[in-house]
């Protein structure tokens, strides 16, 4: 995942400039901090929190501007101006996603945003590379885990059930869509 995060995030910071307005960013399920380190290298004013299981963060390398916190995202999520969920929601059932999203909602200030990066399944049969990737990932997630890939409408439903006021799709980067769930408008 480290190599995937490096390639993905280097492209993401070129096309998604909303990180510039943040003073703090929490990467939930951030592994060893690769994605957050790339963001903070471009935006050094951001106070980064890399949040993952205790056994993951205890062995993470030290990056400037990143604090590591171990915990369980289904119990509580650290507070921040924004929260990043990259390739996380597709691992879990709708029920677990709603629990996680509610925890993220509680950790955000008014007008805070959750930045979600995940595949979006097409509604109609498509043969383009984006659709093939999403469908292939859906088969893998369904077979190996309790998760699944979701359509735009399914993501919007999860956001609404967790309390978010607004859902929008921002851009596409290497197989993943950048989405924002806004706490209040």
What annotation goes with each model-predicted range?
Residues 62, 160, 165:
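Short polybasic/polar patches that bind polyanions
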């Amino acid at each position: 995942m480290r190599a995937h995060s490096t390639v993905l995030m280097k492209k993401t910071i070129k096309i998604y400039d909303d990180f510039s307005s943040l003073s703090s960013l929490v990467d939930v399920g951030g592994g060893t901090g690769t994605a957050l380190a790339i963001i903070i290298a471009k935006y050094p004013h951001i106070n980064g929190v890399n949040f993952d299981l205790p056994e993951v963060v205890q062995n993470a390398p030290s990056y400037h501007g990143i604090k590591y916190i171990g915990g369980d995202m289904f119990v509580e999520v650290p507070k921040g101006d924004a929260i990043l969920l990259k390739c996380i929601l597709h691992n879990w059932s709708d029920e677990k996603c709603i629990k996680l999203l509610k925890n993220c909602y509680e950790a955000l200030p008014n007008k805070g945003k959750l930045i979600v990066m995940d595949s979006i399944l097409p509604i109609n049969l498509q043969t383009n590379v984006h659709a093939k990737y999403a469908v292939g990932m859906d088969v893998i997630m369904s077979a190996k885990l309790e998760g699944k890939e979701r359509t735009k409408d399914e993501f919007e439903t999860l956001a609404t059930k967790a309390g978010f006021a607004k859902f929008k799709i921002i851009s596409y980067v290497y197989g993943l869509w950048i989405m924002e769930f806004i706490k209040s408008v």
